Amino acid sequence: MITNRSAQPGRALLMSTIASLALMSCASASAQTRTTSTPQITQAEAQQGAQANVQILQEFGGALTGPQASYVESVGKNIAVQSGLGNARDSFNVALLNSSVNNAFAIPGGYIYTTRQLVGLMNNEAELAGVLGHEVAHVAARHSQRRQQTAQRNSILGALGSILSGVLLGNSGLGRAIGQGIQQGSQLLTLKFSRSQELEADQLGQQYLTRAGYDPHAMATLLASLAAQNSLDAQLQGRNSGQVPAWASTHPDPASRVAAATQRAGRTAGMTNRDTFLTRIDGLLYGDDPKQGVIEGQRFIHPDLQLAFTAPNGFYMVNGTSAVSINGQNGQAQLTLARYGGSLENYIYDVFQKIAGQNAQLRPSAVQRTTVNGIPAAYATARANTGNGQVDVTVFAYEFARDRAYHFQAITAAGRSGVFNSMFGSMRRITTAEAQRVVPRQIDVVTVGPRDTVQSLASRMAYSSGQMERFRVLNGLRNSDSVAPGQKVKLVVYAR
């Protein structure tokens, strides 16, 4: 979620940098066809990629270090060299991001990223190489600049205000945004590619796999795992499975791409390095990092900031580096922080000003003061007209210290803001003892014993619901699949 620092104003700079990268790539690849050699990374791309990299790492919780990160880096560089963007491994920078979202992407300049959560979903080294190769392929094929005019910035975890500002300025309909679900909290900063570009990246990625000696079928098996994870997430969160988050939302329809990837792979074989991969990722942090807060059912608890709240029934939460979002059919909200000068009234008006931008029609009501579980608090609501009717925008702020405040910002249909009242009233401080009881989850690779079954292994998963389904998806097992003695499988357990 959020760390104990104010949100940085660097996202606009970051997007400007990425836009510049796309334009430079366009100039270098304007005459490129799929049959010519790939233009190599230019010095200008490398310089601007380095600039964007700093801010991307901030947006995504930073890069992990240690043996697991080094392993991902090694695999990523090996596969990236196959693209022709650079002749040496040192031409590329590969980062394992501390994010609990299934995501991977690359930017011009040789910068490649994957999240620890996506790595945890994988089941062999070839799948890791396939995902990273797919992302490198987008850069090699210069897809970003070919989508420049229609590219969408998906800064999930970006301020709700950026969405509302666009809506209120007429860039989209807020009613439609509510109906589709505002995708926040998922730490995604990339360009949305067309289906044809995704298929081309799949194809190029499989070519890189084959050149590197990997099994090209790994692209299909990873896509199948992503499709299964998307479906499971929707089931657990009580949302429509068509509302896919993160990597799947910018990499359309992974399920339908499985068949195409399988057909392309044909009878070609190669290495998967399954046991090596599982050994290397053993102990990898999985799910929320307590330093960013943890979601447990309907409750969010942040041990470092010593706060907790409960989302309303029927809503699901998504956590990230700088915010936690609360999403449902009847509204969306986000908890974050902003600079605080000691006045809740001024704080709330500043939040509304950021939401509205230049739109003078968003006028909040008078700020109301209250106390929530002993915490000084204040709130205000503004009504806005959209093409699909009126909506209410509510800001509810809490003073945790003279120099520190947090706030919810929420949107609902007009007159329906009460749906979040229970959540607003649930905010509380937690004790040191409560904070110490928050334990991270991690991947635990185990060897199946002679008496083990899917059910017995799943019962060891550190979740109160969906243990069987989570175990099967995590290990790429279909409903009819069983486990065999000696086989290595992944569990998610509480860190010791």
Specify the residue positions occupied by each region the protein language model found:
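Helix N-cap / loop-to-helix initiation motif
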Residues: 124, 194, 215, 464-467
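Extracellular LysM carbohydrate-binding repeats and other cell-envelope/extracellular binding modules
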Residues: 467-496
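Extracytoplasmic and endomembrane cell-envelope/extracellular-matrix remodeling and assembly machinery
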Residues: 35-39, 50, 189, 195-452, ...
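Peri-catalytic and regulatory segments of divalent metal-dependent proteins
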Residues: 30-169, 187-190, 207-242, 247, ...
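Active-site-proximal segment of zinc-dependent metalloprotease catalytic domains
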Residues: 178-186
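Bacterial N-terminal signal peptides that target proteins for export
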Residues: 2-17
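Bacterial N-terminal signal peptides
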Residues: 15-25
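Short alpha-helical segments in extracytoplasmic peptidoglycan/chitin-binding modules
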Residues: 454-462, 468-472
